[in-house]
Design a protein with these regions (language model features):
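Acidic-glycine-rich active-site phosphate/pyrophosphate-binding loop
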Residues: 98-113, 191-203, 330-331, 362
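Glycine/charged-rich beta-loop-alpha catalytic/anionic-binding loops adjacent to active sites
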Residues: 110-122, 205-209, 336, 368-372
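A non-catalytic alpha/beta surface segment that caps or lines the substrate-entry region
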Residues: 39-86
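N-terminal capping segment at the start of a domain
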Residues: 14-44, 312, 371-373
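Acidic, glycine-rich active-site loops and adjacent beta-strand->loop/helix elements
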Residues: 67-69, 97-99, 154-162, 184-186, ...
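Active-site metal-coordination/substrate-binding segment of hydrolases
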Residues: 47, 72-73, 80, 86-155, ...
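Acidic/histidine-rich catalytic neighborhood of metal-dependent amide-processing enzymes
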Residues: 119-195, 237, 243, 254-255, ...
Length: 404
């Protein structure tokens, strides 16, 4: 594959303030990407479109084996761009290619500066807005020969399926040790802190019986689960901690006392101690509920029981306000007369995983709103502002390399 080194900066563009993104081009690319179906584990079509885009811009591109590992039809797309400022820090720019359901045959509708759908699907601005911004920034850098260091672009798969694309990424193959994920809905904030999360699956075992003839000979697993859930602290636990039971599966028929039910849950916290406490609290509530449900019949004792599977979903993100990437973004915002604040979020994203892998990555907003719903919309003015800020961050990094 052809490898293009982005040319030296023009002297007239040293300050970079007169270099603007092409709003029309960015808007059109975003709409094009939105129309490409890309549910988790089915990102092949958009990956091929982005592969062509990256190669046209001169990157060395490859696709890793994450798709094989997670049962998808394509892996993470990685593109390496060679810069023209060898002393500048290599930067990572990343966004995810997949969308949540319902996300097929999306019809984007433009009303002034607001992009939304026909109400039958999500928009897919999460996270195709981030993908489009990265493409536009790289094109502006190339076309204007702006100063920049090496840039590693990572378009991940399966972010919406538990960040598994990022988890499968070999970060050792990247040159960049710091950078940005573009995957947030709150404009004016750079997210530098995010919680760790535990994922839980509880299988509650009861005893089946005929619900009409002899219900007293059964132990309802659903009733046991309900008893345990009723004792749990869920939702907003405190300013650092949340918990949720999101899936309940069980039962075979209305005339059978159910002998099994599965609960799928999560807990999140910015505090490891609180995360451990909340996780054990949820487990204990179910185990204590099971202990209260005992049946003696035919000379035997039957007791409800709980099987628990608990695993770390992702570690917390905690990037210092003094980190180089934070300082760069804040300097870029100041140059553009934009107010931006560092902020903690309750959500997890690929940045959590990248930081866990030893990188220093923050999460920047893109203008998306009401994500994961059919009411999702995006403000193009915020999209353009975010793109301009990323462009200025890249330019500053190349124009003012770190002092050795």
């Amino acid at each position: 594959m052809r490898k293009l080194v982005i040319g030296a900066a023009r002297q007239t563009d040293t300050l970079g303030f007169n270099i603007l993104i092409n709003q029309e081009r960015l808007k059109n690319l975003l709409i094009e990407l939105i129309k490409i179906d890309s549910l988790s584990r089915r990102e092949y079509d958009i990956a091929m479109r982005l592969k062509r885009e990256m190669e046209e811009l001169g990157a060395t591109v490859w696709i890793d084996d994450a798709g094989e590992k997670v049962g998808g039809n394509v892996g993470n797309l990685i593109a390496n761009f060679s810069g023209n400022a060898p002393s500048a820090r290599p930067l990572l720019l990343s966004a995810h290619m997949d969308t949540v359901v319902p996300g097929e045959r999306i019809v984007p509708l433009l009303d002034g500066d607001i992009l939304r759908t026909d109400g039958k699907t999500v928009l897919g601005g999460d996270d195709k807005s981030g993908v489009a911004i990265i493409c536009e920034v790289l094109r502006v850098v190339k076309d204007n020969r702006l100063p920049c260091g090496d840039i590693d672009v990572v378009f991940t798969i399966c972010e919406e399926a538990g960040l598994v694309g990022a988890k499968c990424l070999d970060a050792g193959r990247l040159r960049a040790r710091t950078g940005l994920v573009l995957d947030s809905d709150s404009v004016g904030f750079l997210f530098t802190k995010a919680p760790a999360a535990n994922r839980m699956e509880f299988r509650v075992h009861g005893l089946e019986a005929h619900a009409g003839v002899c219900p007293e000979k059964g132990i309802s697993a659903i009733k046991v689960a309900a008893d345990g859930i009723a004792q749990m602290k869920l939702g907003r636990i405190d300013h650092e901690t949340t918990a949720n039971i999101g899936v309940i599966e069980g039962g075979m028929a209305v005339n059978i006392v159910p002998n099994s039910v599965i609960l799928k849950a999560e807990a999140r916290s910015h505090s490891q101690e609180k995360l451990d406490q909340q996780t054990q609290h949820m487990r204990r509530c179910l185990e204590e509920a099971a202990a209260r449900h005992e049946l003696r019949a035919d000379g035997k004792v039957f007791r409800a029981r709980v099987e628990a599977k608990i695993e770390r979903d992702y570690d917390r993100m905690n990037v210092s306000d003094q980190a180089p990437i934070v300082q760069l973004v804040q300097a870029a915002a100041e140059n553009l007369n934009i107010e931006i604040k560092t902020q903690a979020t309750g959500g997890g994203c690929d940045a959590n995983v990248f930081n866990q892998k030893g990188l220093e990555v923050a999460n920047l907003s893109t203008g998306m709103r009401d994500i994961h719903t059919v009411n999702e919309w995006l403000d193009l003015k915020d999209l353009y502002l975010s793109a301009q800020m990323v462009l200025e961050t890249v330019r500053l990094n190349g124009a003012h390399p770190p002092v050795a």
